[in-house]
């Protein structure tokens, strides 16, 4: 009986922590809206992107920069 009460109390406090947690950045809301946008516009999805933008780290032997230039391990 005591163990059951402890388990219920722990579950309640855990749920209460998640419910009352302050999400000032609206992280989940932004995540879901972004995912919905990518479903509506598949061209905007990062999974379809095959090259790296300027300023991103690249490899010397196999550069995958959109511009085709990999200078000092950074896409130009």
Swiss-Prot record:
Pfam families: Conotoxin. GO terms for cellular component: extracellular region. Disulfide bonds join 51-66, 58-70, 65-75. Residues 1-21 form the signal peptide. Keywords: Cleavage on pair of basic residues, Disulfide bond, Knottin, Neurotoxin, Secreted, Signal, Toxin. Residues 22-48 form a propeptide. The presence of a 'disulfide through disulfide knot' structurally defines this protein as a knottin. The cysteine framework is VI/VII (C-C-CC-C-C). Belongs to the conotoxin O1 superfamily. This is Conotoxin MaIr332. It comes from Conus marmoreus (Marble cone).
